[in-house]
Each structure stands twice: as structure tokens, then as C-alpha cells.
């Protein structure tokens, strides 16, 4: 009887440990808040990514979410899964994402599905970047549409087959000011919901 009790206790302990690890790694639920969390107008980051201060949970989340884990001097990452009104981003809706100059040498915004992978579509339109912003006329005041189907005109990032999705802003070679004070320096892109399926 004592052996059975020990076995049951061991199994329960292992199960609890596994669930905790998966949760912290972001493989179930939304993940634990670990590391040095930064949040600016719904765009979130972890300032320990790419540093020796990153603990195992942070490193597991980085691996899960496909970030390159460069040092902050090389690149910083901000992710959002909500629009400017706080609603979850969804393939069923159309959004306008807009912004201006970013404090770094180059930047990009990429869309990922609910499993943190690129959506499985063939639209060849999963990101927008500084080069495209400059090519469209004004790199200091840019915008693009996020929708499952492309607009007749303008820049487009496809959410087709993305379900509930998020977007990651990468800023390469960020300025020292951004590294020192991200909350005060980052000019966060606006994510405005224009319409959703079923809207009149």
C-alpha cells in the first residue's frame, strides 16, 4: 500500500511539473510572465531575450515562438495579439496597421498564427517592413491592411488561415535610447479594426 501511495504521488508530481513547464514555455495557455517584461500600448517584449540573464523558461518560450534571440544591441522584439481597443486579433476581421519611423536601422512586422507559426497560405504576404514602407512612398508615415483577402489597392499582410493571430515587430540595431527606455521611446504601431465578418 505504501509503495502504491508513493507511485501515485510520484506520477502526480511529474504531471504537475510537466504542466508547469509547458505553461511557462507557452505551449499551453498564454504562458507565465517570466524575465524582464516590457509592455507598451499592447506591444509586449521580454528584455532578457538574447541575454545570459534569460532563465530556462524564457529560453523555452523563445524557442517556441521562433525568435532569433539576438542580443538587444542587435535586435529587439515586440508582439501584440490585440487591436487598439483591446480585442483579440482574428482572421475574421480586417485591420489597418499604421506607424512611422522606428528607432533602429531596419524593422519588420510579421504575422503568426495561434500556434506561433506562419499561416499555411500561399499569399506570399506575411510581413511588412521598412523597405516596403519606403517603396510605397513615405517611410515615415506608412500603413498596411491585414485581412484574409487582399484589398484592391495598398499594402497587404495576409491573415488567411491564421485564426486568432499575433504580430511581431522586430527592430534591428535599435538605438541606445530604445534599449534604455522602451516604454518612453517606442512609437508603437496602431492596429485599428475596420470590420469583422458579420458586420453590417
Residue ranges of model-derived segments:
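A compositional/structural signature for long, glycine/proline-rich flexible linkers
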Residues: 1-200
Amino acid at each position: 500500500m505504501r509503495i502504491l501511495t508513493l507511485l501515485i504521488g510520484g506520477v502526480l508530481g511529474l504531471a504537475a511539473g510537466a504542466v508547469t513547464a509547458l505553461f511557462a514555455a507557452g505551449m499551453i495557455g498564454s504562458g507565465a510572465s517570466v524575465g524582464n517584461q516590457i509592455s507598451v500600448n499592447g506591444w509586449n517584449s521580454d528584455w532578457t531575450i538574447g541575454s545570459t540573464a534569460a532563465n530556462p523558461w524564457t529560453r523555452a518560450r523563445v524557442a517556441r515562438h521562433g525568435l532569433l534571440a539576438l542580443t538587444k544591441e542587435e535586435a529587439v522584439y515586440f508582439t501584440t495579439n490585440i487591436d487598439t481597443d483591446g480585442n483579440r486579433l482574428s482572421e475574421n476581421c480586417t485591420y489597418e496597421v499604421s506607424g512611422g519611423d522606428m528607432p533602429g536601422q531596419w524593422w519588420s512586422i510579421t504575422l503568426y498564427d495561434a500556434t506561433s507559426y506562419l499561416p499555411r497560405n500561399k499569399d506570399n504576404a506575411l510581413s511588412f517592413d521598412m523597405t516596403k514602407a519606403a517603396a510605397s512612398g513615405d517611410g515615415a508615415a506608412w500603413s498596411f491592411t491585414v485581412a484574409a483577402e487582399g484589398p484592391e489597392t495598398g499594402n497587404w499582410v495576409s491573415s488567411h488561415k491564421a485564426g486568432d493571430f499575433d504580430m511581431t515587430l522586430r527592430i534591428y540595431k535599435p538605438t541606445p535610447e530604445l534599449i534604455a527606455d522602451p516604454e518612453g521611446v517606442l512609437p508603437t504601431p496602431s492596429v485599428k479594426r475596420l470590420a469583422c465578418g458579420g458586420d453590417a
